[in-house]
Amino acid sequence: MRVIAGEAKGRTLVVPRSGGTRSATDRIRETLFAIVEPQLEGARVLDLFAGAGTLGIEALSRGAAHATFVERGAEAVKALRRNLETTKLAARSVVVSANVIAYLDSGPRDQRFDLVFCDPPFADVGIAEATLGHDGLRSAVARSGLIVARAHRKHLPAVPTFLDIARVKEIGEEKLLFLRYIDPTAGG
């Protein structure tokens, strides 16, 4: 797996040996970033369930100012840190080794993110729903911020009523949900 575009284009990314992560394919990343590209320059990115960091690293490579990666798996965090070093993007990032819900419970209150990736395990729709509905996420998203949730097309999470589904993109067995808060004062 490689970075597709930007300053780290072509750099190889490693994935955890133990498995347990499901990195976004080139096709998924190409589609996703074609849609969010206009918002990337100077953006602050939050990559939840980051795995090896493919989404956040791609965002940094394409011009995001900073990325915070949240991942609980030790092997995934190790691969993520290695990927940030390999791509020379570590200085513009923070890696939080934690459960996403625990991070949102305690975490990003003083930060506002322009772009959030929510890429939980497909088998756990409940964790996707808990994350999207979490007050900690709501307070961490900038007013014009965008949340991109990745899910299996047959197992979509219920989207909270305070989020607007701005766009849905189906790619093979997956769907990308592009979400914004309905009330612009709802986010930070």
Language model features by range: what are they?
Residues 1-188:
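Class I S-adenosyl-L-methionine-dependent methyltransferase catalytic core
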